[in-house]
């Protein structure tokens, strides 16, 4: 045992790889290495058909804005089932057109609403507006032919 102690074995056994207080700290937003918008995602979905891509991207920008307004209303009214339903809907739409960071954040909100974690919903819901705005800017630049 003396040889193990000399090599630091006992120190290793008593160390933790993280501070346990970090486990209880809430997350303000889902850390996301995902891109705000992946322009190849829409092509993987519908192929190289530019007209179809344009139509789906245009529809996403309009319907996502409406869905986001619904999420904001559900959040303001503390309506967890509606928040979950709308977050699920926006998640699917966002991922299909390549708004990956928005889709991931919607997934986190949907999961929090499903778990009835109101505190987490309170932190996540307001972050969607900024992610949608960033995604919309990139998508609209593509639609206008500048990206």
Where are these regions (language model features)?
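Two-component system phosphorelay core
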Residues: 3-147
């Amino acid at each position: 045992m003396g040889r193990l102690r000399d090599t630091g074995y006992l120190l290793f056994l008593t160390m933790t790889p993280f501070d346990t207080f970090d486990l209880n700290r809430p997350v303000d937003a889902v850390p996301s290495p995902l891109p705000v918008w992946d322009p190849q995602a829409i092509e993987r979905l519908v192929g190289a058909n530019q007209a179809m891509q344009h139509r789906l991207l245009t529809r996403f920008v309009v319907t996502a804005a409406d869905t986001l307004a619904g999420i904001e209303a559900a959040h303001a009214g503390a309506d967890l089932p509606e928040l979950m339903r709308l977050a699920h809907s926006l998640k699917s739409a966002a991922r299909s057109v390549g708004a990956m960071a928005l889709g991931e954040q919607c997934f986190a909100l949907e999961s929090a609403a499903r778990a009835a974690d109101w505190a987490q919903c309170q932190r996540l819901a307001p972050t969607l507006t900024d992610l949608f705005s960033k995604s919309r800017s990139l998508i609209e630049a593509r639609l206008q032919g500048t990206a």
